[in-house]
Amino acid sequence: MCDKEFMWALKNGDLDEVKDYVAKGEDVNRTLEGGRKPLHYAADCGQLEILEFLLLKGADINAPDKHHITPLLSAVYEGHVSCVKLLLSKGADKTVKGPDGLTALEATDNQAIKALLQ
C-alpha cells in the first residue's frame, strides 16, 4: 500500500478512503513514511472522525512518533481543541513530555486546551 496516498487520506479527512485502506489490511499502528503513525497525521490535521475511527480499530493512543511526540501533543501543538478533548476522553497520557521537555499543558497558550488539560 502506498504511504503517500494513505497519508493524504488521513490528513485531508477522507474517512471512506481510510476505512478502505484498513479493510484491505492496513495496520493502524504501522509507522508510515516520515516516521509517524496514522493517529499522528489525523491529530496534526484536526481530523476528528478519522481519530475516532483509528482508535476504534485499535490505534495506540500514546504511541510516540520518531520525534517522541504523541498524538495528544500533535493535536495540542496544532490547536485542535476537539481532537485534544477526544484523545483525553479515550485515555491519552497528558503527562508525557515532548522533545522540548514540556508536557501538553506547558506547551500550549490556547486557553480552551489548557482548561481540558488541567
UniProtKB/Swiss-Prot annotation:
SMART domains named among the record's database cross-references: ANK
GO terms of molecular function: sequence-specific DNA binding
Residue numbers bearing the N6-acetyllysine modification: 4, 11, 24
InterPro entries, A to Z: Ankyrin_rpt, Ankyrin_rpt-contain_sf
Cellular compartment(s): Cytoplasm; Nucleus; Cytoplasm, Perinuclear region
Residues with PTM Phosphothreonine: 31
Principal location listed in the UniProt entry: cytoplasm
Start-end of each ANK repeat: 2-30, 34-66, 67-99
Domain of life: Eukaryota
Modified residues (N-acetylcysteine): 2
Alphabetical UniProt keywords: Acetylation, ANK repeat, Cytoplasm, Nucleus, Phosphoprotein, Repeat
Alphabetical GO biological process terms: catecholamine metabolic process; cellular response to mechanical stimulus; cerebellar granule cell differentiation; neuron differentiation; positive regulation of cardiac muscle hypertrophy; positive regulation of cell growth; positive regulation of macromolecule biosynthetic process; positive regulation of NF-kappaB transcription factor activity
Cellular-component GO terms for this entry: axon; cytoplasm; cytosol; F-actin capping protein complex; nucleus; perinuclear region of cytoplasm
PROSITE patterns reported in the protein's UniProt record: ANK_REP_REGION, ANK_REPEAT
Family under the similarity heading: Belongs to the myotrophin family.
Assembly and interaction partners: Interacts with the heterodimer formed by CAPZA1 and CAPZB. Interacts with RELA.
Role summary: Plays a role in the regulation of the growth of actin filaments. Inhibits the activity of the F-actin-capping protein complex formed by the CAPZA1 and CAPZB heterodimer. Promotes dimerization of NF-kappa-B subunits and regulates NF-kappa-B transcription factor activity. Promotes growth of cardiomyocytes, but not cardiomyocyte proliferation. Promotes cardiac muscle hypertrophy.
Name the record gives this protein: Myotrophin
Source organism (scientific name): Rattus norvegicus
Gene name in the database record: Mtpn
